[in-house]
């Protein structure tokens, strides 16, 4: 599976995808690509330097961890939608949620959901 770049676990960072390496992961995960995590907003579950495996899908269930593009930046957060509002919630309580309302929703694209985490590769 291709390791295609990095994703922020904190403040969203510029989204760039280039195949940096290939990694082996369990076929059961049905992952399409992997990203290296930077930051600690998703600690204790996902640590700085972990590799997350992502299954491409345009929608996720409330509470699932998603790779989300916000304009030209990307971040990894728990995704919640309620009506015309989307909230991206960190695992680390030191980080405030990112909230987007009706006028901002066209800036948000779900790239996929986390289906596996690799540590120490």
Give the positions of each predicted feature.
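Glycine- and charge-enriched low-complexity intrinsically disordered segments
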Residues: 82-121
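Short, mixed charged/polar active-site loops
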Residues: 74-76, 97
């Amino acid at each position: 599976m291709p390791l295609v770049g990095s994703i922020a676990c904190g403040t969203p960072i510029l989204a760039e995808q280039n195949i940096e390496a290939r990694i082996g992961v369990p076929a059961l995960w049905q992952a399409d690509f992997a990203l290296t995590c930077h930051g600690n907003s998703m600690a204790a579950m996902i640590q700085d330097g972990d590799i997350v495996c992502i299954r491409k899908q345009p929608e996720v269930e409330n509470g699932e961890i998603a790779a989300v593009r916000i304009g030209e930046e990307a971040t990894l957060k728990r995704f919640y939608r309620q009506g015309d509002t989307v909230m991206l919630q960190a695992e680390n309580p030191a980080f405030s949620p990112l909230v987007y309302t009706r006028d901002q929703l066209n800036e948000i694209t779900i790239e996929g959901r986390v289906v596996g985490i690799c540590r120490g590769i």
